[in-house]
């Protein structure tokens, strides 16, 4: 299996229908929003994928604005969503590159990046039906808040169709 080094580009697959790509081998699905907690979880997801010899699917979700715009506004909103998707894809590439740079050894597995339009929780729960493991981070705000799960990780733990690994943020200074 070819590994992915810090200097290599990983293609981003855009799923505009609000669904993660189907027909793929079950693997480790990592939710990534670019936050420090999600980067920490992504690193752990890379390790899990390597340990099990599974592909790693890194997923970012863009939640489009609600429908029902006045005449003339729909086109502006569509342009905004397209810009947001492009921005999220760039951010996802940067997030993966950051984690790859910080790893002691290069990621020795197969990885693909996916940007999906839809509700974050709904997309993750749907995607979990086809995966070996779902990896998510916590809110990781420190102190008491660090003991609480965010809404996404909480929904994943309670409703995902596969095992869920919730990765707490590393202890801060």
Model features per residue range: what roles?
Residues 133-158, 173:
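Glycine-rich, Arg-bearing micro-motifs that act as flexible, cationic patches
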Residues 162-173:
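Short, flexible loop segments at boundaries between secondary-structure elements
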Residues 3-20, 60-91, 173:
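Acidic, proline/glycine-rich short linear motifs
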Residues 28, 45, 124, 135, ...:
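Hydrophobic structural packing positions in well-ordered secondary structure
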Residues 57-59, 112-116, 165:
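General small-molecule cofactor/ligand-binding pocket signal
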Residues 48, 52-55, 109, 133, ...:
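Short glycine/serine/threonine/alanine-rich loop segments
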Residues 17-78, 127:
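Small/aliphatic-rich secondary-structure junction motif
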Residues 1-24, 37, 98-134, 171-173:
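Structural beta-alpha unit
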């Amino acid at each position: 299996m070819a590994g992915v080094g810090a200097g290599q580009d990983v293609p981003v697959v855009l799923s505009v229908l609000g669904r993660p790509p189907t027909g793929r081998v079950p693997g480790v699905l990592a939710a990534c929003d670019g936050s420090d907690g999600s980067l920490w979880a992504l690193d752990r997801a890379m390790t899990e994928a390597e340990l099990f010899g599974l592909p790693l699917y890194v997923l970012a979700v863009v939640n489009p604005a609600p429908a029902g715009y006045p005449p003339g506004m729909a086109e502006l909103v569509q342009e905004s969503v397209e810009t947001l998707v492009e921005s999220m894809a760039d951010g996802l590439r940067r997030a993966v590159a950051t984690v790859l740079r910080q790893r002691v050894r290069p990621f020795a597995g197969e990885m693909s990046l996916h940007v999906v339009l839809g509700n974050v929780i709904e997309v993750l729960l749907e995607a979990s039906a086809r995966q070996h493991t779902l990896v998510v981070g916590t809110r990781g705000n420190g102190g008491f808040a660090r003991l609480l799960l965010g809404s996404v990780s909480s929904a994943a733990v309670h409703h995902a169709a596969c095992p869920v690994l919730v990765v707490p943020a590393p202890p801060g200074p």
